[in-house]
A protein has these predicted regions:
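Receiver (REC) domain active-site loop signature in two-component systems and cognate sites
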Residues: 55
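C-terminal output helix
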Residues: 104-114
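Charged docking surfaces used in two-component/phosphorelay signaling
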Residues: 15-23
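Helix N-cap/capping motif at the beta->alpha junctions
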Residues: 30-39, 60
Length: 120
């Protein structure tokens, strides 16, 4: 079982993703914006940050950059409808994070999470 921090501003999607990831056997802490994720990241208690890119207050790319400093061993995965932004923006996110474009099937999400965690 891995500990996953989910940052997603869409309430319905966040609840849906949390349930699916928990059913796959992982522990999930979810927040609705990047700024709320920072204290959890600083705790160092998470294996994976699963974050949307477009969120209020702090986008997922900035959140991943801060995560690289606060918890360098934590893996990062983006879920977004704006994959081109993640792939083209020059940034210093940890270890070339995986980008999963919305819409996606839950089995694809869980499969990608398992790949990332097993490679860590």
């Amino acid at each position: 079982m891995a500990r996953i921090l989910l940052a997603e501003d869409d309430d319905t999607l966040r609840v849906f993703l949390t349930r699916a990831i928990e059913r796959a056997g992982h522990e999930v802490t979810d927040v609705d914006r990047g700024t709320k994720a920072l204290p959890f990241i600083a705790s160092g208690d998470f294996d994976l940050l699963l974050t949307d890119i477009v969120m209020p207050e702090m986008d997922g790319i900035e959140l991943a950059q801060r995560a690289a400093t606060l918890a360098p061993k934590m893996q990062v995965m983006f879920i977004t409808g704006f994959a081109a932004v993640a792939l083209n923006r020059k940034n210093e996110t940890p270890q070339q994070p995986k980008v999963l474009s919305k819409p996606f099937h839950l089995r694809d999400l869980v499969g990608e999470i398992e790949k990332i965690l097993s490679a860590a």
